């Protein structure tokens, strides 16, 4: 788990069937709060997660 925003952590996953990476975001209690779309590279998925966490966190 990696922190993507204040109080928001996430886990990078590979969707084998779809052939791409996505990040599932969770709050501190472990409740799912969001998910990025599919990206070809892990780096792009992480960047999308940072942007999504900023929107969710209200920054």
Features from the language model and the residues they span:
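A short, structured beta-strand/loop element
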Residues: 14-36
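A short, exposed loop/beta-hairpin motif centered on an aromatic-Gly-Thr core
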Residues: 30-44, 52
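Hydrophobic alpha-helical segments, principally membrane-spanning helices and signal/leader peptides
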Residues: 4, 25-26, 42
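Short N-terminal "domain-start" leader segments
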Residues: 1-22, 51, 55, 59
């Amino acid at each position: 788990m990696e922190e993507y925003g204040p109080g928001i952590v996430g886990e990078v996953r590979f969707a084998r069937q779809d052939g791409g990476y996505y990040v599932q975001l969770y709050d501190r209690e472990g409740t799912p709060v969001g998910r990025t779309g599919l990206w070809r590279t892990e780096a792009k998925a992480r960047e999308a997660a940072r942007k999504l966490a900023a929107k969710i966190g209200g920054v």
